[in-house]
């Protein structure tokens, strides 16, 4: 479930989709320096997609 993540994980964005007029939430947390773990979830807490990304500032 998406909402059972650690406390440092937070909603960083949300997307209004045309699919059933639902809302998707993007959660992000920093695992290491500049290394982020993102999760895309539905309003019901179902994880649709997750990925790691290194952010270069």
Curated annotation (Swiss-Prot):
Disulfide bonds: none annotated. Keywords: Nucleus. It is found in: Nucleus. A motif (Nuclear localization signal) lies at residues 6-10. Mesophyll protoplasts. One of its GO terms (cellular component) is nucleus. Coiled coil: none annotated. Stress response. May play a role in the reentering of protoplasts into the cell cycle. This is Stress response protein.
């Amino acid at each position: 479930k998406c909402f059972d993540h650690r406390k440092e994980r937070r909603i960083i964005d949300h997307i209004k989709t045309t699919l059933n007029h639902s809302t998707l939430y993007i959660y992000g947390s920093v695992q290491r320096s500049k290394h982020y773990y993102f999760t895309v979830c539905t309003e019901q807490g179902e994880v649709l997609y997750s990925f790691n990304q290194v952010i270069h500032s």
